[in-house]
């Protein structure tokens, strides 16, 4: 359908690409904390970031999204990349077995859901989160005004990196 095609194209747009590349550029130094880390990308859409992460590990890479179509499309787009796609809700997904836990869609999730999701990770895992201030998108229910506000909302023990990526109409934080 047209809606699906637009969604796939949007998942690969310039801002998405810049955001994913920025995540890897600023985070890859921490991947070495683990030998062949296992990685989970929550709300991973069609798996573009999971595909990029696969270049940095021989460990398991999982991309999950609550939309079952993301799994179907992801399998087709990234066939042969050894990525596990699953349709699951972040509300229930168990992330305990993963060394690296990523969510680049925090603006789509309520704060309570993010907090509960992070409580389920294993101690010592690397958490990489992104959120933006693109308030004008209806689905963006959890935007913040700046990176400090975002950071405070997370209640994390230790912050290894914080930064801002300026994009066309908004800023992205990590």
Model-predicted segments: where are they?
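S-adenosyl-L-methionine
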Residues: 1-34, 66-100
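C-terminal substrate-binding/active-site "lid" region of AdoMet-derived donor-dependent transferases
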Residues: 111-174
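A short SAM/SAH-binding and catalytic strip from SAM-dependent methyltransferases
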Residues: 98-113
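Conserved class I S-adenosyl-L-methionine
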Residues: 34-46
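Conserved SAM-binding motif I beta-strand of class I
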Residues: 59-65
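Conserved SAM-binding loop of SAM-dependent methyltransferases across substrates and taxa
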Residues: 46-57
